[in-house]
Amino acid sequence: MIRESIVGPDGGEVVRLGPATVRILEDGSTTGHRLGIGEITVAPHSSGPPQHRHARHDEGFYVVSGTARFTVGAASYDAPAGTLAMIPPGAPHTFANPGDEPLVLLNTFTPDLYVQYFRDLRELAGSGPGAGGPTAEAVGEIMSRYATEVTDVYAGD
């Protein structure tokens, strides 16, 4: 029997990735793996991941606080608190924090594939080559496990 999940403000699993911290709030175990949810906090004046696209999951970003800069393909959008960005499979995207305050995003994945991606990156960062962190090739291999690739081109274009 699947039980409910209530995660308090200090709960969840924390994954630190450079200037960002991901707090996993729902890893899919309560939702039959239909939905994963994380809270991403990005340091001021920080970029996010390289622009990339997913083949097998939708991704949502709700701006809780701060202002996000979303780039989708060639278009960029400054998104203040209260903005929702939904990214379908095949759409290249990234985000950044251009502001002076931390950016907090509520991040959803349907299905929950990307929760394990964050865990895999954490493990890789712990075994990366010195202070330089993991290589681009190693990160690319992890991305490919989750049908994700670095690109700024829409799938099918």
Which residue stretches match the model-derived regions?
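Acidic/histidine-enriched, glycine/proline-rich intrinsically disordered or flexible terminal extensions
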Residues: 119-157
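Ligand-binding loop in jelly-roll beta-barrel domains
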Residues: 69, 89-115
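Short beta-strand segments
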Residues: 49-51, 72-77
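Conserved GNAT-family N-acetyltransferase fold
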Residues: 40, 61, 85
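A short glycine-rich, His/Asp/Glu-containing loop-to-beta-strand
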Residues: 12-51, 57-58, 108
